[in-house]
């Protein structure tokens, strides 16, 4: 899905592909109640009246303490999942953000976040950790090289 429409019934959310000057990607380690851990990009749901861009800036500030201008919207993702016994159908837009600061100062971290890490591309390629979206390690290479898609595309679950 690459148009501006939010699928009916889906929770809209913004996600951030945050890159530092060394071209490392910031990921947050999330943990479910059952102990399963995986790595995700910063981001979260839109609040009433927010645009996707507003939510991306707010989530960046809350989850990292950083303020930065947004780059392009490059990916979308719709996925349904169970989180701690609750069903969620989520539609996400991913925005590129480049920062000069690699010091994270979370202001309002979500309770499920148990860690942060700046990931070099090579570490992403060789890791056996779980990432969301699953194709993150494949798709982030062109973003690091500033080769952005002409239109946002579905990055898969």
Name each model feature, range by range.
Residues 2-25, 71, 96:
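Conserved N-terminal beta-strand and adjoining loop/helix that marks the start
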Residues 11, 34, 41, 68, ...:
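Short connector loops at helix/strand junctions that flank enzyme active sites
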Residues 20, 32, 83:
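Acidic surface patches and DE-rich sequence motifs
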Residues 23-62:
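Conserved Nudix-box catalytic region and its N-terminal flanking loop in Nudix hydrolases
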Residues 34-37, 108-157:
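Nudix hydrolase/Nudix homology domain
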Residues 46-69, 77-131:
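Unchanged
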């Amino acid at each position: 899905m690459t148009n501006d429409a939010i699928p009916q019934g889906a929770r809209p959310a913004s996600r951030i592909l945050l890159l530092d000057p060394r071209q490392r990607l910031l990921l947050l380690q999330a943990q479910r109640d059952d102990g399963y851990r995986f790595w995700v990009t910063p981001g979260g749901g839109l609040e009433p009246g927010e645009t996707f861009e507003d939510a991306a800036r707010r989530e960046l500030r809350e989850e990292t303490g950083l303020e930065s201008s947004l780059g392009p919207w490059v990916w979308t993702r719709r996925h349904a999942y169970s989180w701690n016994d609750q069903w969620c159908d989520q539609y996400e837009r991913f925005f590129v953000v480049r920062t000069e600061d690699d010091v994270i100062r979370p202001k309002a971290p979500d309770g499920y976040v148990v860690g942060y890490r700046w990931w070099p591309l090579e570490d992403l390629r060789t890791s056996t950790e779980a990432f969301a979206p699953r194709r993150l390690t494949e798709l982030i290479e062109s973003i690091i090289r500033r080769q952005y898609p002409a239109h946002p595309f579905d990055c898969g679950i």
